[in-house]
Amino acid sequence: MPEMANDPPFCGYSRPAHRLHAMNPAPPAPAATHTFVWHDYETFGADVRRDRPAQFAAIRTDAELNEIGEPVMAYCQPATDYLPDPDACLITGITPQECLAKGESEAAFAARIERLLAEPGTIGVGYNTLRFDDEVTRFLFWRNLIDPYAREWQNGCGRWDILDLVRATWALRPEGITWPERPDGGGPSFKLEHLTAANGLAHESAHDALSDVRATLALARLIRQKQPKLFDFCFALHRKDRVAQELGLPCAPAHARPFVHISGMFPTERGC
């Protein structure tokens, strides 16, 4: 989960301007049966197409964010024809030797993750997952002859990203959360370690996969506690049909409505 949180490329939330104060979303379906798998990768580089995973961690929770079962932690043995990025090893503290000693083959590693994320009703979620971790998963599955996309939509499964929820909370409902400033004074920092430190949330070791997962889950619980309607509204938008419904699609251009769009495409000084 490289920290691109201040200016990642795309995605966000839209909201009709005349409905900003009426967040009464229909409950996501199926509201009573889905579970979240909060997960994170540490990798041997930042290129999701070329670089390989080093470590994976995950925690499954119910819809109320209560943990289910034991956390998952796994290491992946690097391929013999692959050279890890030394800078990535310095950042994470994970070496190829450690992964060779503790890990399993990439095929077994991929199969384990696929079983976890493809369990019916699972919503895969994390911090910056849509732009990084999910891409790592897709290329990992592709290399190991697993359908890269099936776990994202089959059997009631889906995916979500807490980073966009954090942006929406700052822009629309900032009360109850302490928002740290970026070191350069350019606005709020959405880096996970900055947010956890500012809000007194445990984050023992940034760039350790399980520590990052627990920090992400703690931040999600805080937002859900302080802004429950916004949390439920944003979660509902992980489904394409709910997005289309919210946008009023399909509609003719003459009936299009103005929207407030919250996205990493826009700088924070513009309220996004």
What are these regions (language model features)?
Residues 2-8:
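Extreme N-terminal basic, low-complexity initiation segments
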Residues 12-15, 19-37, 241:
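N-terminal accessory regions of nucleic-acid-interacting proteins
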Residues 39-42, 58:
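N-terminal phosphate-binding or glycine-rich loops at protein starts, especially the Walker A/P-loop
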Residues 42-49:
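Short acidic, Gly/Ser-rich segments with clustered Asp/Glu that frequently serve as metal-coordination loops
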Residues 20-27, 221-272:
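Acidic two-metal-ion nuclease catalytic site recognized across multiple nuclease folds
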Residues 34-35, 50-56, 60-92, 115-229:
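Metal-dependent phosphoesterase core characteristic of DEDDh/y 3'-5' exonuclease domains
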Residues 91-112, 116:
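Metal-dependent phosphoesterase signature
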Residues 24-29, 83-84, 101:
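Anionic ligand-binding catalytic core segments
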